[in-house]
Amino acid sequence: MNVIWRSCICRLRQGKVPHRCQSGVHPVAPLGSRILTDPAKVFEHNMWDHMQWSKEEEDAARKKVEENSATRVAPEEQVKFESDANKYWDIFYQTHKNKFFKNRNWLLREFPEILPVNQNTKEKVGESSWDQVGSSISRTQGTETHCQESFVSPEPGSRGRSAPDPDLEEYSKGPGKTEPFPGSNATFRILEVGCGAGNSVFPILNTLQNIPGSFLYCCDFASEAVELVKSHESYSEAQCSAFIHDVCDDGLAYPFPDGILDVVLLVFVLSSIHPDRALFI
């Protein structure tokens, strides 16, 4: 699988200091140079560089870790929670629906590398979001971009928008498998693993709808989460395919052939998987 490096950078010409891809919402800042000097402006960006804890903050964090580790889960309970994890997440989504997590409207501003290069797009964050954001955010990624290298690990021949591969349109030649797969006509494809209620899905779709030939796959091992995505008013099978899938089970098939993805996105996913199972991703 492709992985989006959280430390993605774009290098300017002539060996200048690394910069992130240009964003029309936030000013271009060299990677590592976004320093919080005024605490009153802490919410102006989603993240800040080189934040250092005070001695008091470090001691408080250590105390919390010790408190959390004081009570351990019994081994038999660990097995149950691990084997039935999807069921517990189903209960979570049955209880909280789409109200627990906020939409990641910052995602494409902080990581514009997710989108195809050299695309003119407008990011619309509006009523199609779960949290019904009232305002819309416009951003334009110019055709003369500073980013010459994306550092998003690509599939061979990807990252640009190429012509559709006719061999992919009916990749399943076996009996009963003659239908084109979802997104078979797309030229740029993203997969989000662990989509939950769609808090990354719909901010991304708001932008992808302005990029012809793009398609978004999203999966979760909790069936309730997938149903929440499919029930959203902005969900369209013409540009998105949501499906149930456990990425730790390498015996499960995907609804698309190997080698067609341009970007794979995992947001707060790896940290929730047992290290032993993460080896199968």
From Swiss-Prot:
It holds the Pfam family Methyltransf_12. The keyword S-adenosyl-L-methionine applies. Residues 139-180 are annotated as: Disordered. Gene3D superfamilies: Vaccinia Virus protein VP39 (3.40.50.150). Keywords: Cytoplasm, Isopeptide bond, Methyltransferase, Mitochondrion, Nucleus, S-adenosyl-L-methionine, Transferase, Transit peptide, tRNA processing, Ubl conjugation. InterPro entries: Methyltransf_12, METTL2/6/8-like, SAM-dependent_MTases_sf. It is found in: Mitochondrion; Cytoplasm; Nucleus. The keyword NAD does not apply. Disruption phenotype: Mice were born with normal Mendelian ratio without developmental defects. Cells show reduced N(3)-methylcytidine modification in mRNAs. GO terms for molecular function: histone acetyltransferase activity; mRNA methyltransferase activity; tRNA (cytidine-3-)-methyltransferase activity. GO terms for cellular component: cytoplasm; mitochondrion; nucleus. It catalyses: cytidine(32) in tRNA(Ser) + S-adenosyl-L-methionine = N(3)-methylcytidine(32) in tRNA(Ser) + S-adenosyl-L-homocysteine + H(+); cytidine(32) in tRNA(Thr) + S-adenosyl-L-methionine = N(3)-methylcytidine(32) in tRNA(Thr) + S-adenosyl-L-homocysteine + H(+); a cytidine in mRNA + S-adenosyl-L-methionine = an N(3)-methylcytidine in mRNA + S-adenosyl-L-homocysteine + H(+). It comes from the Eukaryota. GO terms for biological process: fat cell differentiation; positive regulation of mitochondrial translation; skeletal muscle tissue development; tRNA C3-cytosine methylation. Residues 139-151 have a biased composition (Polar residues). Its EC number is 2.1.1.-. S-adenosyl-L-methionine binds at residues 89, 93, 194, 220, 246. There is a cross-link at residue 80 (Glycyl lysine isopeptide (Lys-Gly) (interchain with G-Cter in SUMO)). Residues 1-22 form a transit peptide. Mitochondrial S-adenosyl-L-methionine-dependent methyltransferase that mediates N(3)-methylcytidine modification of residue 32 of the tRNA anticodon loop of mitochondrial tRNA(Ser)(UCN) and tRNA(Thr). N(3)-methylcytidine methylation modification regulates mitochondrial translation efficiency and is required for activity of the respiratory chain. N(3)-methylcytidine methylation of mitochondrial tRNA(Ser)(UCN) requires the formation of N(6)-dimethylallyladenosine(37) (i6A37) by TRIT1 as prerequisite. May also mediate N(3)-methylcytidine modification of mRNAs. Belongs to the methyltransferase superfamily. METL family. Interacts with EP300. This is tRNA N(3)-cytidine methyltransferase METTL8, mitochondrial. It comes from Mus musculus (Mouse).
